[in-house]
Amino acid sequence: MEERMLMFPYILNLLAAMLLGALIGAERQWRQRMAGLRTNALVATGAAVFILSSMTTSPDSPGRIAAQIVSGIGFLGAGVIMREGMNVRGLNTAATLWCSAGIGVLCGLGQFKNALAATIIILCANILLREAAQRINQLPVSAEAEKRYILKVTCNKEDESAVRQWLLNIVKEAAICLQGLGSVPAQEQGYKEIRAELVGHADYRKTRELIISRIGDNDNITAIHWSIDSQ
């Protein structure tokens, strides 16, 4: 009987961590994110297990274990972050996993009220701030804001080095930041498509006009495509 009474707080802490983690994960699942209901529930429960285990073996070590949990969640969060060109996806999901671990730590320490309050705030951040961010994105872009561009240039395979140098000179002259430069075989045999990822001011017309005006200076270029990165 005494053993059951000792087990009850342990189980209660784990159940609270699982339920609150699942509540956070339900919002992620609803939005079809990679880390959904089960992942967040398991992260919160796992964090609570580590805290409870540390309190059992050494009551003075929960703070040290909590720091180790934060480090461990960093590796887990990195697994849901994907880079597609210049776009990075999964940051919100990774941050939510980190928050779920924090909820688990609070539940492991028996701070249920704090854990519930933190869960509500996390849900508000994921739901309400999402709408606010979408409204802000719909506002007119400031001329001083940065914008991402994709510049694709097609040339003969033999002229790739010369065209790359030409692109570097253009970037330097236009005073824009080059984030990435690579090449892939073009659709036509014997040709290369060079892709430059650029970051500059939202008022891109001057940069575009400069690039277009310089196309005639390079006979090695057979095609060029300029676009704004939508992400």
From Swiss-Prot:
Its biological purpose is as follows:
Virulence factor required for growth in low Mg(2+) medium and for intramacrophage survival. May be involved in regulating membrane potential by activating Na(+)/K(+)-ATPase.
Where does it live in the cell? Cell inner membrane
Protein keywords: Cell inner membrane, Cell membrane, Membrane, Transmembrane, Transmembrane helix, Virulence
Q: Under which name does UniProt file this protein?
A: Protein MgtC
TM region(s), chain numbering? 5-25, 39-59, 62-82, 103-123
**Record flagged with keyword Membrane:** yes
Q: Does the keyword Oxidoreductase apply?
A: no
Which NCBIfam families has this protein been placed in?
PRK15385.1
Q: Which gene encodes it?
A: mgtC
* GO CC annotation, single: plasma membrane
Protein family: Belongs to the MgtC/SapB family.
Gene3D superfamilies with a match to the protein in the record: 3.30.70.260
UniProt membrane topology term? Multi-pass membrane protein
- Matching Pfam families: MgtC, MgtC_SapB_C
